[in-house]
Amino acid sequence: LVAQEKNNIPKLARAVIIAEQLAGKLVIQNESSISPYKLNPEKAIDHFLFYYSAKWSPGCQKFITQLKKFYVKAKTESKNFEIIFVSRDDSEKEMSEYMINEKMPWPAIRFDQLNKLGFVNDAGGRGVPCISVLDSRGLILAHSYHNKSNYIGTKEPLEEFAKLIDFKWSDTDDNSQEAIKE
């Protein structure tokens, strides 16, 4: 809570156990299809990065290349985190196409579950792309918005996430431009 108050980050109403809330509600792309995905119950995940994005957003199209590079490199050094895609697309078809076309290496919340997970909506922002970094109990540690309305972009919360998972990352590792909220 101190991190939330200090940085004017949105707060969730109560603590949630993220892995439990996501059980049975995730999918992942496998080349040309979408399949159910299960978090490994034997492996505790300390940090989650929820990536709110949409196929129709040019800002998301710019940022996803950087996020994929980050994910692949970070997974070679740290296994104790997960990125979860939260679609802001208008249909399940658009979400699936986006996941497959971009070859997203991380899981996503099933389209039919997006409105059923209150903490996911509470942790989001008004526009995309948006990053919300949570610990395993639902404390928001970094966010693309300050005070729920001031968009700061994706760079700062991604850098904070890298520190939390003890991964040395610099946006100079990639030539992608900072995403602009849409």
Language-model segments: what does each one mean?
Residues A54-P58, R88-K93, Q113-N115, G138-I140, ...:
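Solvent-exposed loop/turn segments at secondary-structure junctions
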Residues L49-F50, I131:
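Hydrophobic beta-strand anchors of alpha/beta hydrolase catalytic cores
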Residues L1-N30, K181-E182:
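N-terminal targeting signals for export/organelle localization
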Residues L134-E182:
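Thiol-/selenol-based redox modules, centered on thioredoxin-like
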Residues Q21-F48:
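A short beta-strand-turn-helix
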Residues Y52-K69:
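Conserved redox-active cysteine motifs that mediate thiol-disulfide chemistry
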Residues R88-G127, S132-V133:
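Thioredoxin-like thiol-disulfide oxidoreductase module
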